Amino acid sequence: MALVLNEEQNMLKDAAKDFCTNNTPITQLRRLRDEKSALGFDDATWRQMVDLGWAGICIPEEFGGLGFGYTGMGVVLEECGRTLTASPMVATLGLGASCILHGGSDDQKRAILPQVAGGEVLLALALEESPHHQPYGAATTAEKSANGYTVTGGKKFVLDGHVANKVVVVARTAGQPGDRDGLTLVLVDQSAAGVTTTR
């Protein structure tokens, strides 16, 4: 099935193609690789993307985003893919912000999504615990505490987890690993006591 873009989406596609062609050539990715960049992306380029509104491309306008939805994000990411543009966009928007948008409370949406759209907060999703994709295999637990939840466990392969300010953690609040029920999304601040990240 072919995706037919409307006029606004075509304008977005053209703008994204122009930006990526002129600002993020493949040589930028090679430079990041050769320099063993700690971030994994060029921060100045990400700031330019934020200025274009791309940090809020799929976030609804009511939460400070552009409201282009996932089609708009897909259009931008397709053009980023043409030049292998390195950015935290997939982890922050495609994974983290999507979890908050579809699973977060209204208060969480109002508090966090405008910060994401403004480029102030980077997000990640912590799902995997084994070398194989087993979303129901989560053994990480979240127990109610005085300040919300206490999360115990570890995650692997967290895309952009090393740069995220906040991580959406898939944790078990009931049941056993393998059970389809009892999984909860818990928002964890990277600066919280006990949180460690290795790369």
Annotate each predicted stretch with a short phrase:
Residues S87-D107:
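N-terminal glycine-rich flavin-associated loop
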Residues G103-A117:
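A generic, well-ordered mixed alpha/beta core segment in the N-terminal half of proteins
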